[in-house]
């Protein structure tokens, strides 16, 4: 099971783009997206142990402190972005200082997260307020197995875990329904993301 890596997009203004970060060691920080499970029937085996996380309705982003250039880098899903207090991603970092603290203590690990509060599902947040929820970590070009990532990132705020156990196709639709598990959200669950416990 491979992470869905869409093509790099050229959308957005070049004025706010930053040069991709320099990496110490192997790998990069590819763009990241999820795709519909209905398109990939049979990718999971009945009974295989999986994690099912809540799919939050927000903006996909990535963060990294590079030991090579000793800089903290902010990226949207498609682009690396200059740290400009006028943009949502920089504001989200300022409002969630635990993220930058963790990145600086764990250099060269890419943190993939969702910014919530910017889309039509507000998760209980007032206008201009954002929260970050982590859903993956990458090191040396490899996504870290999820249980290892949870332990390594125990000081991070993770997307809510909906289910852990044997994969059942019949259960997936049921898990998509109901209220968000984000504390104080007060809105519906957008969906779920199913992952194997061990990357494969």
Predicted feature residues:
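Core nucleotide-handling region used for phosphoryl-transfer chemistry
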Residues: 1-200
């Amino acid at each position: 099971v491979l992470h869905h890596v869409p093509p790099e997009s050229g959308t957005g203004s070049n004025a706010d783009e930053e040069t991709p970060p320099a990496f110490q060691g192997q790998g990069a920080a590819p763009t990241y997206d999820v795709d519909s499970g209905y398109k990939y029937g049979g990718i999971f085996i009945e009974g295989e142990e999986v994690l099912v996380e809540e799919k939050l309705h927000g903006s996909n982003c990535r963060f990294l402190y590079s030991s090579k250039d000793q800089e903290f880098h902010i990226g949207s899903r498609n682009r690396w972005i200059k740290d400009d207090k006028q943009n949502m991603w920089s504001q989200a970092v300022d409002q969630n200082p635990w993220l930058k603290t963790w990145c600086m203590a764990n250099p060269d690990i890419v943190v993939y997260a969702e910014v919530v509060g910017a889309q039509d599902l507000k998760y209980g947040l007032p206008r201009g307020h954002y929260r970050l929820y982590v859903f993956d970590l990458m090191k040396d070009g490899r996504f870290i197995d999820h249980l290892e990532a949870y332990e390594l990132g125990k000081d991070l705020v993770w997307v809510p875990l909906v289910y852990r156990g044997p994969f059942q196709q019949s259960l997936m639709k049921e898990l998509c329904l109901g209220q968000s598990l984000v504390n104080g959200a007060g809105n519906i669950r957008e969906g779920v993301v199913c992952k194997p416990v061990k990357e494969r």
